[in-house]
Amino acid sequence: ESINLADNFAFTGTVTGAGGVNTPAFAARINGEQTISHNTSTKLTLNTEIFDTANAYDTSTYRFTPQTAGKYYCTLNINSNANGQGNFRIANAQIYFNGSLAYISGYDKATGYENNGRESLSAIITFNGSSDYIEPYFYGYTQNSGNITIGGTNTYDSQFSAYKIIE
C-alpha cells in the first residue's frame, strides 16, 4: 500500500525526523543614535538585543560568535541620515568576518544625491562554531564631508541578525 502525501494525517504520539530548528539565532538593534564620520568605516553600536537564543551576540563588542558550526543567514539593515550635510554620495552596509571586511552593500551615486539612506545586506556565512565572528559596520561618503546619523526615532530601522540554516 502506498501513502498519498496530499492527504491529511492525524497522528498520535510523537512525530520525529520532521522539520528542524534555526538556532542559534539573534537580532539586535541600535538604542538611540550613533554619529558616523564622513569617509570612514565605523562599527555600529547595535547594543540592544531583540532576542538571542544562545547568548552568542555580545552587546558590548557588537559581535555575533555562534558556538554551533554551520551556515548562517545573516542580515544588516541600516537607516542612515546625512543630516542635510551635502547628502550621500556613497553609503554601504558592511559585515566584517573575523575582523576583516567580507560583505558590502552597494550604493554609489554620481548625481542626484539622497539625504536619507536605507542600506540592506544579506549573506550566507559559514562559521566554525568556536572562534568565527561577524560585526556590523557602515561606510558613508557625503558631498561636503558632513557627519552621518545612524538610528533615530524608530531604532528598529537599524538591525543586525543571523540564524542557522537547517542543513
Where are these regions (language model features)?
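Register-specific beta-strand positions within repetitive beta-rich fiber domains
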Residues: 1-19
